[in-house]
Amino acid sequence: METMINLMDHELHGRTLGWRPNDIVVGRFTDNINNYQLGVLEAIRFTTVRLKDSLTRMGDADTYDPDLEKALHLFMNRATSFYFPSAESCYQEAVDHLKAFVEKLKTGKRSFYYRKDNLVALINNYKDLLGNVNRSLIDGNVGWWNSDDYFYYAKGVAHAYYEILRVVRVGYQTQLASTLYGLDIMDEILHELRRVEEMSPWIILNGDLDGWIANHRANLNAPLSEVVHLMVVVSQL
């Protein structure tokens, strides 16, 4: 939970000029950061869904936590909205609800349920988003002028998943260790996501896959495709 809070706090307050996708002046010139933030947001949305639906519920008969319900609703607000209400105000309120849920965890009013089926549900959820990211990275109809949008969106998703899955590996260590190569596969997922984070070309090129000019979307897609494959393996362990 703290990881999700820290990720959103950084995008809302840690960056110079804060949230960019709804900035009608500065945002016009910072599309790389805009799309990176959108990627982080989408990963947070997917994670909040799983937190609400399974990770914090004993079973289907258990009630949803109201703070997680409100946080999810607020995270779903349009990222480009700059008034009535602004994206920043909605996301900050969502973060506040996550913080309220953390307090419930500390006082024992709520719990995490580290079951293997919850881990599989989370991994499948992440796999679905990454599959969509993969398709956008290999889309041959993407032009030179917007290829960087897809590149940085994918990096935002990968960054959020890297930070969250580092925590998941610790929390689900017992469940992963009980399956053959479970921990090794999770470590490899983290390694591939780290590779994505380390890709930072000065200019995003969009050459042909068999051309002499680089295609950075395709380069980014390689480790992300491996992550999707490894997530399929984890979900079947």
Language-model segments: what does each one mean?
Residues 1-87:
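N-terminal Sec/ER secretory leader and immediately downstream segment
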Residues 21-32, 144-148, 202-218:
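A cross-kingdom feature marking solvent-exposed beta-strand/loop segments within repeated
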Residues 56-63, 138, 173-180, 201, ...:
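Structured alpha-helical bundle/scaffold domains in large eukaryotic membrane-trafficking regulators
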Residues 76-89, 191-209:
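Charged/polar, low-hydrophobicity segments characteristic of intrinsically disordered regions
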Residues 88-190, 194-198:
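Extended amphipathic alpha-helical interaction segments
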Residues 192, 199-237:
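C-terminal accessory extensions/subdomains outside the catalytic/core fold
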